[in-house]
């Protein structure tokens, strides 16, 4: 019970720190950018979610880690990494908004489901082995960035205003 409480406290602190960093540093930079430029660095970050496949590697995680937890978490991360790369490729296309919504909904649901499944099976933090840092440090960052993408997607889109208008002849 004590270690599970420490696990939860670690996650809570990460959410607080990443949330403060987002408010103080990330959002002030992103809010002044157009949609494509604002989401691009976030998509690159999420493209690394293939690292979730490490939940399937013996020796990295405990053999006692439930496969009913590890498999959906690993493959959900892989799917989200692929969706992030597809959204990056489509940033300048007519499918940009749709690909961003798909990436963001699937990615956020995947992370929330991972926390839910870990709680449902009463995951013992020690079973995570070297992947302990993923749910305690990385997932809070990823969820904060999903919130930023939702905020970017929900804000009104304005057309770019040319710096100078051509002179009438």
Give the residues covered by each predicted segment.
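Non-cytosolic membrane-interface motifs at loop->transmembrane helix junctions
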Residues: 64-75, 99-102, 125-135
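Hydrophobic transmembrane alpha-helical segments in integral membrane proteins
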Residues: 1-18
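Juxtamembrane "helix-exit" motif on the non-cytosolic side of transmembrane helices
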Residues: 24-25, 55-64, 116-125
């Amino acid at each position: 019970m004590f270690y599970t409480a420490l696990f939860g406290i670690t996650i809570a602190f990460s959410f607080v720190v990443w949330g403060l960093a987002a408010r103080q540093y990330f959002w002030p930079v992103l809010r002044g950018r157009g949609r494509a430029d604002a989401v691009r660095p976030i998509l690159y970050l999420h493209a690394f979610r293939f690292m979730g496949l490490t939940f399937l590697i013996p020796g990295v995680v405990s053999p006692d880690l439930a496969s009913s937890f590890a498999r959906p978490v690993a493959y959900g991360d892989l799917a989200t990494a692929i969706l992030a790369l597809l959204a990056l490729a489509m940033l300048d296309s007519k499918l940009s908004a749709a690909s961003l919504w798909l990436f963001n909904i699937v990615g956020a649901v995947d992370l929330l489901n991972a926390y839910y499944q870990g709680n449902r099976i009463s995951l013992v933090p020690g079973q995570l082995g070297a992947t302990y840092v993923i749910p305690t440090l990385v997932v809070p960052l990823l969820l904060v960035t999903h919130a930023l993408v939702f905020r970017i997607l929900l804000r009104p889109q304005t057309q770019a205003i040319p710096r100078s208008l051509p002179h009438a002849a």
